[in-house]
Amino acid sequence: KINLDQELKKGNFLIGLKQYLGANVDSLSGNKKLTFETKNNFLTLHSSNGVKYKAKKINILWQAVPLEIPYTIERLVFGPFASYESAQKKAIRLKEEGYNPQIVYPKDWEVWIPVEKELPSKKLNYQLFKKSYNSEIVPFFVDEYSEQKLEGPIYISSDDEIIINGVSVGNQFYLAKDSYGTWTLIQKIEIDDYLKGVIPHEIGSSSPLEALKVQAVI
């Protein structure tokens, strides 16, 4: 089973590289397709619904799949805020008042809370968001012979550097559904690689190991 929480518990880093995949604002897979490829070694794909595939090139296509039962989402939206820190302050105040806030970034920093039976006072300066959905964005593995529906999280890895739509990034990735009904590309970086690569670049490779570890946590 693919479990992102387990990766975090192991001390690995999960970095969101690109959000809103499959949506109209998707700038990475604007043609609704992600291509993962390597120059030498094979790629391996594992989907949460049991689909497994191994090749030097993997195509994932986003499709809007009709729902048998449409659903409606309601939430109260605060913002937009100029920065994450401003949104965080608002979220803290809402939590102190007994609400369950979520800090998000669909286009700007916002704070969302669920709609309850009694709406908060308008003095809190929020907007009511309500939207009905009759389809969902679903990833499909496609090749020249067939296509297979995938379920997230999806894990894609290789011993080689992986090229995604022409851009070389790393060699371990996840695709996971987000709070907006779209998908996020997440890079997995193991703690040892982070200490050897990113952190020495930030504070100097000659720094003591303990200092590097502290910087990684920060």
Question: Could you tell me what each predicted segment is?
Answer:
Residues 1-218:
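Conserved, single-site charged/polar hotspot
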